[in-house]
Amino acid sequence: MTHCCSPCCQPTCCRTTCCRTTCWKPTTVTTCSSTPCCQPSCCVSSCCQPCCRPTCCQNTCCQPTCVTSCCQPSCCSTPCCQPTCCGSSCDQSSSCAPVYCRRTCYYPTTVCLPGCLNQSCGSNCCQPCCRPACCETTCFQPTCVSSCCQPFCC
């Protein structure tokens, strides 16, 4: 059946709780023929505005293009570059590519994720902090948050 999710929150089609707590944009979900409506294959474009559940983060928000535009501090139960979200090598310094430091963390050159080598991210890993995600999801340690994040950020 096509267009069974417009609006998305029809219980017989998409499962109301899925549409409301995961996809958030009911009107943008138009199909759910073979898979549950709120799986990434159905809601990948709308699931991240905002992304409010770990399942959304794990399945769709780890792509740099998605992370930079939608992931909120309260989105994931664990940071988006941890193994449960982005792969088993994400938090290992030996294989943490610059992309995780520069794209996933929102900041082009100055923010390091735990495990990322300083030479890949720059020496001032937490400065400046321009989004709440840096304070709450990326920087972890209070010493980092209190010493580098701007007041308007945290």
UniProtKB/Swiss-Prot annotation:
The protein's assembly and partners: Interacts with hair keratins.
Job of this protein: In the hair cortex, hair keratin intermediate filaments are embedded in an interfilamentous matrix, consisting of hair keratin-associated proteins (KRTAP), which are essential for the formation of a rigid and resistant hair shaft through their extensive disulfide bond cross-linking with abundant cysteine residues of hair keratins. The matrix proteins include the high-sulfur and high-glycine-tyrosine keratins.
Alphabetized UniProt keyword annotations: Keratin, Repeat
Region (15 X 5 AA repeats of C-C-[RQVGE]-[SPTN]-[TASPF]) location: 8-152
Disulfides per UniProt: none
Sequence repeat boundaries on the chain: 8-12, 13-17, 18-22, 37-41, 42-46, 51-55, 56-60, 61-65, 70-74, 75-79, 80-84, 85-89, 129-133, 134-138, 148-152
Family to which this protein belongs: Belongs to the KRTAP type 9 family.
Protein name according to UniProt: Keratin-associated protein 9-4
Transmembrane regions listed in the UniProt entry: none
GO CC annotation, single: keratin filament
Native species: Homo sapiens (Human)
Pfam families: Keratin_B2_2 (PF13885)
Gene name of the record: KRTAP9-4
